[in-house]
Amino acid sequence: MTNIRKSHPLIKIINHSLIDLPAPSNISTWWNFGSLLGVCLMLQIVTGLFLAMHYTADTSTAFSSVTHICRDVNYGWLIRYLHANGASMFFILIYLHIGRGIYYGSFTLMETWNIGVVLLFTVMATAFMGYVLPWGQMSFWGATVITNLLSAIPYIGPNLVEWIWGGFSVDKATLTRFFAFHFILPFIITAMVMIHLLFLHETGSNNPSGLDSNSDKIPFHPYYTIKDTLGFMFMALTLTTLVLFTPDLLGDPDNYTPANPLNTPPHIKPEWYFLFAYAILRSIPNKLGGVLALVFSILILILFPMLHLSKQRSMSFRPLSQCLLWILAANLTILTWIGGQPVEHPFITIGQLASVIYFFIILILMPTTSLMENKLLKW
């Protein structure tokens, strides 16, 4: 009799994805982030569901309902901080996952990569709308500033903004719809993750060498299930340490003040994981130009397969390209720092320089370095 794992219509799908999946024998810990992101997504959905049971999406009670969750609900503080810091964890893992993809040339798996970019945009939209829900000062003003950027779109911009707001300012209608979208999007993300995996399993995973690994595959279970479990333990340790010791480390103190449309905070800024894009947005004095730069700073990921001119897939054996990638990582760190600083000298100039360097490295230096490495290797 055939094993039920291999014959049952539903169980065999899980079997082909997580148990008997042929995986390259040499994938490193950098390949753990996909499964970690899956666990993170499940954690966010579960904690979010419990928060939604006690939250009220109304401007007059939203802030106090979050306070009620933290003070009166059993372990409500834990659920709330797991959800808030889980989002930070999510983005740390996403950025490492993308960095891995760039370093090892995983973007050559075009469908998987493009679905991943769409996923990134969806996750960013979800996180942004989630940040609006507690209805603190930074929630309100962040929503006002970011939604207002759409008014830069020629002709339809102003109407589009009012349509999204559901009125002439960020108000009750905006909060209600943001809650509705924030609730539904994680399930859409889950469906997209399945498509992401479907395309990945069509081609098989990349590996650190960037070479074809069809001649040397091993089953996913037990080798990589145990390896992923170690990753889960590290993630759980990091997240619980953050939640139990410094839950507000990554938050903004302004969000502990209820939203007040008559009082603007001195420095409006998004959560830390958006600061690099926010710095790029602010570095351009023109509104439409800033919005385009903001969108393109993330959309640029789609161009990576076209900008890949090296004869080698991975950067493992390309020290010059490796240096460039680490300079890019340092540059993104500088942009993140600048995004959280006030708009004054010298931060304006540093932000503009870092923004130019960001695009210059990706669009010009990386392709030319690849060509130079080809020449050096006489390829």
Curated annotation (Swiss-Prot):
Binding site for heme b b566: 97, 196
Binding sites annotated in the UniProt record for heme b b562: 83, 182
Cofactors, names only: heme b
Keywords of the record: Electron transport, Heme, Iron, Membrane, Metal-binding, Mitochondrion, Mitochondrion inner membrane, Respiratory chain, Transmembrane, Transmembrane helix, Transport, Ubiquinone
Biological processes per GO annotation: mitochondrial electron transport, ubiquinol to cytochrome c
InterPro entries reported for this sequence: Cyt_b/b6_C (IPR005798), Cyt_b/b6_C_sf (IPR036150), Cyt_b/b6_N (IPR005797), Cytb/b6-like_sf (IPR027387), Cytochrome_b (IPR030689), Cytochrome_b_C_euk/bac (IPR048260), Cytochrome_b_N_euk/bac (IPR048259), Di-haem_cyt_TM (IPR016174)
Location (main, coarse): mitochondrion
Protein's membrane topology: Multi-pass membrane protein
GO MF annotation list: metal ion binding; ubiquinol-cytochrome-c reductase activity
Details of cofactor binding: Binds 2 heme b groups non-covalently.
Entry-linked Pfam families: Cytochrom_B_C (PF00032), Cytochrome_B (PF00033)
Subunit: The cytochrome bc1 complex contains 11 subunits: 3 respiratory subunits (MT-CYB, CYC1 and UQCRFS1), 2 core proteins (UQCRC1 and UQCRC2) and 6 low-molecular weight proteins (UQCRH/QCR6, UQCRB/QCR7, UQCRQ/QCR8, UQCR10/QCR9, UQCR11/QCR10 and a cleavage product of UQCRFS1). This cytochrome bc1 complex then forms a dimer.
Family: Belongs to the cytochrome b family.
Additional facts recorded: Heme 1 (or BL or b562) is low-potential and absorbs at about 562 nm, and heme 2 (or BH or b566) is high-potential and absorbs at about 566 nm.
Designated name of the protein: Cytochrome b
Naturally occurring in which organism (per UniProt): Spalacopus cyanus (Coruro)
Origin organism lineage: Eukaryota, Metazoa, Chordata, Craniata, Vertebrata
Primary gene name: MT-CYB
